């Protein structure tokens, strides 16, 4: 019987691995969200889902839909997804500049109330439509990872103030403190940081260009 124990253990590990792979293959892991204003002054939400292919390449799939501040965007776009969308691995949330000027706390409040969302995720403002940024191709890594690395690299160099969801909320609720957010934009198809946005409470009030 002892000689069979190693074989049984190996079989259990193989079976567990197959189950985990099947579960991952049957869900869409959301890694980024973008919010834009339409010409009708409606909010259009975009979710980013990396699709990992068998040849180890990554295709970035986006799904868009009209979003209301008091409704969950993920629940809305679920109707357009082929597999269930899960929120636990979100890295970035991007707000178009026009929307940020109107106020974004209702969207951020929804994120902080979701127990599956970590407070280390990055929030930022975009000069270009967020749907264009999230749909972009930035090399052989996922779009969310590219944006995360872009921000963290510049924060380590101190070209950007350190900020994330946790820092933003602390600044927002602290009396006399103005939150700041990175501003990103596209130039000839390349994504970069263009400046820092200073907010009065949750509304973009002024910007500082990076040189």
Which sequence ranges carry the predicted segments?
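Membrane-proximal alpha-helical signals and transmembrane carboxylates
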Residues: 2-9, 13, 17-211
């Amino acid at each position: 019987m002892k000689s069979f124990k190693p074989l049984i253990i190996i079989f259990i590990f193989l079976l567990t691995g197959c189950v985990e792979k099947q579960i991952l293959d049957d869900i869409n892991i959301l890694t980024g969200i973008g919010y834009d204003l339409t010409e009708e002054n409606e909010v259009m939400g975009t979710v980013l889902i990396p699709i990992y292919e068998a040849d180890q390449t990554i295709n970035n799939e986006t799904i868009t839909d009209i979003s209301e501040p008091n409704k969950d965007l993920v629940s809305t776009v679920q109707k357009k997804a082929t597999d269930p969308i899960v929120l636990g691995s979100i890295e970035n949330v991007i707000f178009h500049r026009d929307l940020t000027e109107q106020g974004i706390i209702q969207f951020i409040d929804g994120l902080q109330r979701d127990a599956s969302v970590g407070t280390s995720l990055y929030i930022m403002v975009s000069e270009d439509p967020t749907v264009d940024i999230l749909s972009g191709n930035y090399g052989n890594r996922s779009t969310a990872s590219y944006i995360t690395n872009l921000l963290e690299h510049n924060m380590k160099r101190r070209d950007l103030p350190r900020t994330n969801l946790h820092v933003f909320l602390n600044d927002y609720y602290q009396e006399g403190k103005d939150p700041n957010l990175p501003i990103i934009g596209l130039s000839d198809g390349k994504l970069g940081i263009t400046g820092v946005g200073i907010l009065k409470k949750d509304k973009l009030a002024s910007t500082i260009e990076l040189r």
